[in-house]
Regions:
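Short, surface-exposed glycine/acidic/tryptophan-bearing loops
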Residues: 85
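Short aromatic-cysteine micro-motif
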Residues: 1-75, 95-114, 186-187
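Short linear interaction motif-like sites in intrinsically disordered regions of transcription factors
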Residues: 6, 37, 48, 68, ...
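Surface-exposed recognition segments
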Residues: 75-76, 97-99, 116-187
Length: 187
């Protein structure tokens, strides 16, 4: 399956509604994905203007800062859970570019999270921009590309699977090496 950033926010709101949680994402003032229309396959200014209610109790994509904190797992390894890539990540060297692998087949990080390095790149909420100490925790207000983190099975160089590595792409692009992970507010 291929997934773009727009697909990810639809999933988050639909899952939130199915579990009687307050959806986080809004497009044109509506949190109901059934009113948003067809998921775009090209750049779409209406969908790009989606907002996120970070106080809602529903599912959402992590911000880039949250993603990195989760990937580090309370440790300071190069990859999520180890300094040895093959211990924790699926990438070109150990997949022969043959596709996504079953989750939880590599070691977890310090928080017990799997596949934060490799397997599929993970969409984050943020628009891509340079990061500084004064950067907002939820990223810049607009841009051309959304943040992707973690590397994938299609990553030719282990560098892209490093926790500190940043990548981005147009939110309408779908590839089978793109995916997402959801987060919720802690109780």
């Amino acid at each position: 399956n291929e997934v773009n950033w727009y697909d990810a926010i639809v999933y988050c709101n639909k899952r939130s509604k199915a579990e009687n949680l307050t959806p986080c994402y809004s497009i044109d003032g509506s949190t109901d994905p059934d009113t948003w229309g067809t998921v775009p396959t090209s750049s779409n200014s209406t969908w790009d203007a989606a907002t996120c209610d970070f106080e809602a109790n529903g599912y959402r994509l992590p911000t880039e800062a949250e993603w990195e904190w989760l990937a580090r797992g309370g440790q300071n390894y190069t990859y999520a859970g180890s300094d040895t890539i093959d211990r924790v990540a699926w990438y070109t060297e150990n997949t022969n570019t043959t596709g996504t692998r079953e989750v939880k087949t590599k070691a977890p990080n310090g928080y017990g999270l799997y596949d934060m390095s490799g397997n599929v790149y993970e969409w984050c909420w943020d628009w891509s921009d340079s990061i500084s100490d004064s950067s907002a925790a939820d990223g810049v207000a607009s841009g051309n590309n959304r943040v992707l983190r973690g590397g994938s099975w299609f990553t030719f160089d282990g560098l892209y699977c490093q926790v500190a590595n940043r990548n981005s792409d147009n939110p309408n692009l779908r590839f089978n090496w793109y995916g997402f992970r959801v987060v919720r507010l802690a109780n």
